[in-house]
Amino acid sequence: MSTNQETRGFQSEVKQLLQLMIHSLYSNKEIFLRELISNASDAADKLRFKALSNPALYEGDGELRVRVSFDETLGTLTISDNGIGMNREQVIDHLGTIAKSGTKEFLNSLGTDQAKDSQLIGQFGVGFYSAFIVADKVTVKTRAAGETQAVLWESAGEGDYTVADIEKATRGTDVILHLREEEKEFLSEWRLREIIGKYSDHIGLPVEIQTTEYDEEGKVSGQKWEKINKAQALWTRSKIEISDEEYQEFYKHLSHDYNDSLIWAHNKVEGKQDYTSLLYVPAKAPWDLFNRDQKHGLKLYVQRVFIMDDAEVFMPNYLRFMRGLLDTNDLPLNVSREILQENKITASLRAALTKRALQLLEKLAKDDQAKYQTFWNEFGLVLKEGVGEDFANKQQIASLFRFASTQTDSSEQTVSLADYVGRMKEGQKAIYFLTADSYVAAKNSPHLELFNKKGIEVLLLSDRIDEWVVGHLTEFDGKPLQSITKSDLDLGDLADKEQEESQKAQQAEFGSFLERAQSYFGERVKKVVLTHRLTDTPAVVSTDNDEMTTQMAKLFAAMGQKAPEVKYTFELNPDHRMVKKIADLTDETEFNDWIELLFEQALLAERGSLENPAAFIKRMNKLLG
């Protein structure tokens, strides 16, 4: 008998997700059972945790399990647990809404590519709603531990759902799937055993299936519950007993990811610290990777008892893509997030797990370059944050970076700093790099001309974060990183000594020309000088080593912050015919127009834009006319 019944509309994002999910995930529809059993396992974990401080929540039944049964006549499949359960408010919150920030933006990002969408939806975590892949109606009966009032929730997965108060003798949740006619394959004990064995053998909660008992004459004598999984937490087992398939299925259970992980590390540590860790590197970036406020972190267990999801204190922010769990004996069972923040044991575990994660990435890079490239393409931008956040591991983090380079002639970021150092020319003392808005802009920068001529490799950095990265990463393997766009660029032993004498002569020859140009520009430029870094281009602009670069100024602007004005050094190529022609001009107006045009061209090459492009076009048309 139900009372206090009401019909409520789904949150708009739920309706959209249901429709997309049913169509996108149908090809792998059996995952609904994995998701529902995983939810039941989480409910048991939460009850164990709450019962630490309130044992009465067990209500005399501490044997936690999940049961799977079916009724061929009614066409229903039921997944029941005796975990924490839900009250009316929780049912509405958990089953009628999606409490994830950015959900609307995520759904809007989905398109018409079904394969890609299914991957994205899998990363988002479909959970309970996966029931609608195979059911045209879902009924939930639940009672929260320690409460007397139970709740009924029911929906056909369309625009609304019904919620009502009911009676339920036992705590926990029953999810009843009213299967579509074409999904009756799941009303088979053999099929259910197959799926549960495939997806849920690794979880610590016993999964029981209702089986038929027969007497000696082969007649049905009754029903019984049979445990069909190992029911031992995977991470507590010996590594040699666990197959790769089991590790991958546990990853999917843990992360609710739809894809296999790239690599994992399972470690048991005893001695000064006593813990087990299981860390995974995902293959695909989650849709909310760059939302630094989004929850992330490891699942925390203390003495095999679940404590919390997303324990972010055990992994630095730049490794927020890592998935996994930590089971430790060194923390109290009543530990809270606040206690974790200021705990010496936490700091020690964080340092150890960070090292473990970085070693795992090093192993992936060494053993499987193709897989590591997949990782880098997905998570490289986040890993780059590490050089500014983790001084102790800066060099190890930097060794994992990959860059585009003049050596590879490709925008693909495949070159490590160790690769670069191994190819350095004799006498080369620095690692040379160039930052730009894009790979194309970097590859075609006039600053590269001298380096291309001399065959010196330059790293081409075009990610927005790169200017910030090189501000924190000043050296690698004892070699300084040096921007080739700086006015005080020093090639050291790579410089051409014979040319230096002729350059001194040119300095005297062009002295009055430089003074004339400096007089015209006044305070607009820091100084006007001759340069010998160019071969085909008449002029470039550069900044001093201690001054803000163009890319850093753009980074400030992108963050809505006011940056100091960048004052450039204007460098002119004395061997270029255009510079020679301008130096010979006697008409002051003509001289000013030409030198301004060269400056605007140099600014355009450096910044990609001009403050007054119309004036530039007008001046160019005038001089070419």
Swiss-Prot record:
CDD domains: HATPase_Hsp90-like (cd16927). Keywords: ATP-binding, Chaperone, Cytoplasm, Nucleotide-binding, Stress response. Residues 338-554 are annotated as: B. It is found in: Cytoplasm. Residues 555-625 are annotated as: C. Residues 1-337 are annotated as: A. Pfam families: HATPase_c_3 (PF13589), HSP90 (PF00183). Belongs to the heat shock protein 90 family. Molecular chaperone. Has ATPase activity. This is Chaperone protein HtpG. It comes from Actinobacillus pleuropneumoniae serotype 7 (strain AP76).
